[in-house]
Each structure stands twice: as structure tokens, then as C-alpha cells.
């Protein structure tokens, strides 16, 4: 019996994992302050989707659920974000991206029912939904063939300008400056990987500048998040501890 005649069809690849959030502050060194569970599906046509559940324990606690999809060229297609803050509903929104436009339909505890439509420079290349697992996906925008060691990503839209992603969700435009550090071999709880090390060094357009953020993703074209460290006032560390 050929694959097409089989009653079942599994043409996609699936990766599941867990990321822990730890404090790097002197008085809380190594204390777990949150966690994230994610599932990534890579379809036969190159499209990919991530579903992530994120928990930040620091008061006021934040809980976030996202579903984010991209096409075969890593271009954003759609995203769903639901957040609660202090164990209370904050907002729920759906985002859609097409050539030249980004749209949002959302309901929030503060703003009520909101519809947004923004013009974009062609098809939006990346969207920040605040799931840590997605942070490494921005790194594909860096041109490693260029002599520039710090590059601007161009336009990016966020689901929230808050550093913890605890507002909205609604569209908010910024750009990001990324520095390429180099290739490394990285060992985390989930194993040892060939990695690319980058650093977010600027967030033009954000109301409050984000502290420098070192991030390591797999060096295999999938940019799977491995670990990250944020300096400044945040002093937090993220690590992939489980991978299935």
C-alpha cells in the first residue's frame, strides 16, 4: 500500500519543548520565575506553526497563550494571543498579515473592543508575540554574509510594547538592532547543540528601551531557541530544558 493509500497522513514534523525562566539577580540567583511549554509543527509545504503557553510568576503574574503561523519563506501569516495579568483576563486578540497590511481584532480589559489595520512595507517579516521560543526566529533576519556586525531588522510589529508583553494585545510598531557574536557549541538542559549567538542591542520605537539580550538559537536553519540572558534591570535567564 502506498503512502497516499494509507488511512493515516502524517506529513509534518513536530517538536515539543520546555523553557524555564530563571532570575539572575543577586538576591534571587537561579530562582525559577516562570516557564514556557511549546509545540512546533513544520508542514510538508514548509509552513510552520508554534503553540506556546507562557507563565511569569513575578507579581503581577502573567499567563500567555499564543498560536503563531508562518509560510514557507518565514513570512508571518497569522497569530492568536491571549493574556491574563494578576490571574485576571487582560486581553485576547487575533492578528492577520498580508502583503502591505497587518490587522488586529482584539478585546481587552482596558480598551474594550478594538480593530486595527496598519500599512506595512510589503509582507511583514516578523512579529513579536512575546513567547520566548519565538525570540530566536527573529535572528533569521540577520545577514551573516554582510560585513555589518550590527544590523537593523527593519519594521517589526509587537503584540505589546510592554517588556513582559502584559498589555493589549494590540499592534505596536518598532525596529530592532541585532549584533552577531558568532558560532558556538552550547549545552543546555535539553542537550548539546551547534548554535548561533546573537545579541539584541537596541529597540528603536519602544517606549522604554529593552536591556541588552543575548540569545542562542540552533545553527540548522530552524533557529530553535536554546538559551537567552537579559541584562539591565531585568537580569533574567532562559534555558531550553526539555525537547521531544
Region roles according to the model:
Residues 2-108, 155-244:
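Acidic, serine/threonine-rich low-complexity disordered tracts
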Residues 99-162:
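Surface-exposed beta-loop interaction hotspot
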